[in-house]
Amino acid sequence: IVFRAAQERSDIEIVAINDLLDAEYMAYMLKYDSTHGRFNGSVEVKDGHLVVNGQTIRVTAEKDPANLKWNEVGVDVVAEATGIFLTDETARKHIAAGAKKVVLTGPSKDDTPMFVMGVNLKSYAGQEIVSNASCTTNCLAPLAKVINDKFGIVEALMTTVHATTATQKTVDGPFHKDWRGGRGASQNIIPSSTGAAKAVGKVIPELNGKLTGMAFRVPTPNVSVVDLTARLEKPASYKEVCAAIKEAAEGELKGVLGYTEDDVVSTDFNGEKLTSVFDAKAGIALNDNFVKLV
């Protein structure tokens, strides 16, 4: 997904990929995607490297990032997407190998700074290694920021109805850390934990301790939903809340937060470029201090 997104931007050039897959299989997985469809471009393998739209991309299969010699191909930024090197200490091996910056594509397992577009990016101070948080945090944080800035959040609960992920089982199997997580993904709605709400407290410090949440894993291949149920400090009608979100989506958070009043469903957002889209018709309010936002 990172590669496909980069191909749509003229200011990003992919120069190298490190993966334990061989280049032929990598090319196959790039060409064909069951969720996002066929790749719009030419893909071939030459001398063990990928050639995409005529550009050669170095392919390596190193288990230790320290051996990657990023300096040989002029790497500026590494997207660390293995899910393994999620601490400053381990991700710093990329820096030792010649990269200038590292972006972790998931939440860090230590105190590595976490940034969410549209929320706390202005506080970035040139750190070499940062986390881009999780998909759920990127969905939740912009919405929570708007509500907290405009009305104040006293306390809130978040539920994400989350699409199936690669760690789940196709049929029941052992999963010692999470027994329910070991049940068949296509057969069940599976309650699960999520660190997304806690992560929001890191990118919006005012909400630290005011927000927690859980997840339901559901049998869909892509697109997830976040349900934010919040008690507001300043009373506001649901219409006023929607108006504030729409204003932010068309203003300071344009390109990050979206707003829709259409009768949409999850598949309508397959390939969505915005990190969060507020569904005005899906939410409800109990009163002027208690709202559910989707």
Swiss-Prot record:
Pfam families: Gp_dh_C, Gp_dh_N. The keyword Cytoplasm applies. Pathway: Carbohydrate degradation; glycolysis; pyruvate from D-glyceraldehyde 3-phosphate: step 1/5. The record marks 162 as: Activates thiol group during catalysis. Coiled coil: none annotated. CDD domains: GAPDH_I_C, GAPDH_I_N. It is an enzyme of class 1 (oxidoreductase). The active site is at residue 135. GO terms for molecular function: glyceraldehyde-3-phosphate dehydrogenase (NAD+) (phosphorylating) activity; NAD binding; NADP binding. NAD(+) binds at residues 19, 63, 105. One of its GO terms (biological process) is glycolytic process. Homotetramer. Catalyzes the oxidative phosphorylation of glyceraldehyde 3-phosphate (G3P) to 1,3-bisphosphoglycerate (BPG) using the cofactor NAD. The first reaction step involves the formation of a hemiacetal intermediate between G3P and a cysteine residue, and this hemiacetal intermediate is then oxidized to a thioester, with concomitant reduction of NAD to NADH. The reduced NADH is then exchanged with the second NAD, and the thioester is attacked by a nucleophilic inorganic phosphate to produce BPG. This is Glyceraldehyde-3-phosphate dehydrogenase.
